A protein has these predicted regions:
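Extracytoplasmic
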Residues: 1-99, 123, 144, 167
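Active-site-proximal, structured, solvent-exposed surfaces of multi-pass membrane proteins
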Residues: 68-172
Length: 172
C-alpha cells in the first residue's frame, strides 16, 4: 500500500498490476521528453501569482523564465502577468495543460550516457524544454547541426531555441 492509495484515480493514474509487492500505475497524463509552450511567466510573476503548494500544477501551463530574459521569450510566446492569468491552479488546469503540451512535443527521443537526441516539428520558432537539470558549464546543444545556447528555464531545467519546421536536437 502507498501513501497515495485511493488518490491515483483523481490524478489520472490507473492501477495496472502489483509485482514484487509494488503497486504499478499508469499515468494517462504523462508528457514525452521535450515540449514547447505558448505562454510564459517570469520567475517573480509566477511566485506572486501562485502560492507554493499550487505552483507544481501550473508548471505544465507556463514555462517559467528568469526575469531578465522576458524580452527574449516574448518573441516566441505570450507573456502572462499574475493579475491577467485566468488559469487557476488545480487538477483540471493541469490535465488540460498536459494535453496542450502534447500538441507541441518531440516525436523522437533517444539518450545515452553522453547526452540525448530529440526531434520536434514546430509551426513557428519556439523554445523546447527538457526536464533535464541545467548545468552552467555542463551541456552543449545543437539544432540541425548549428550550436545553440543552452537555456535555464523553470527553476533549473534545460531548453533550446528551435526554428519553424523540423528540428534535430542534440545535447551532449
Amino acid at each position: 500500500k502507498t501513501v497515495y492509495e485511493g488518490k491515483h484515480d483523481t490524478l489520472g493514474f490507473t492501477y495496472v498490476d502489483t509485482q514484487n509487492n509494488y503497486n504499478i500505475y499508469e499515468n494517462e497524463y504523462f508528457l514525452p521528453m521535450g515540449f514547447a509552450y505558448t505562454e510564459f511567466m517570469t520567475e517573480s510573476d509566477f511566485e506572486r501569482a501562485y502560492i507554493t503548494n499550487q505552483r507544481h500544477s501550473m508548471l505544465c501551463k507556463y514555462i517559467v523564465v528568469p526575469d531578465e530574459k522576458a524580452d527574449y521569450y516574448s518573441q516566441f510566446m505570450t507573456r502572462v502577468y499574475p493579475n491577467a492569468s485566468k488559469a487557476r491552479a488545480g487538477e483540471e488546469t493541469y490535465k488540460a495543460s498536459v494535453l496542450e503540451r502534447r500538441e507541441m512535443c518531440c516525436s523522437e527521443f533517444d539518450y545515452s550516457s553522453y547526452g540525448f537526441n530529440a526531434k520536434i516539428t514546430l509551426d513557428k520558432p519556439n523554445v523546447v524544454l527538457f526536464s533535464v537539470p541545467y548545468e552552467a558549464d555542463g551541456w552543449t546543444a545543437t539544432v540541425n547541426g548549428t550550436e545553440r545556447e543552452v537555456l535555464r528555464v523553470t527553476y533549473g531545467f534545460v531548453a533550446v531555441e528551435c526554428g519553424a519546421g523540423e528540428n534535430d536536437i542534440e545535447f551532449s
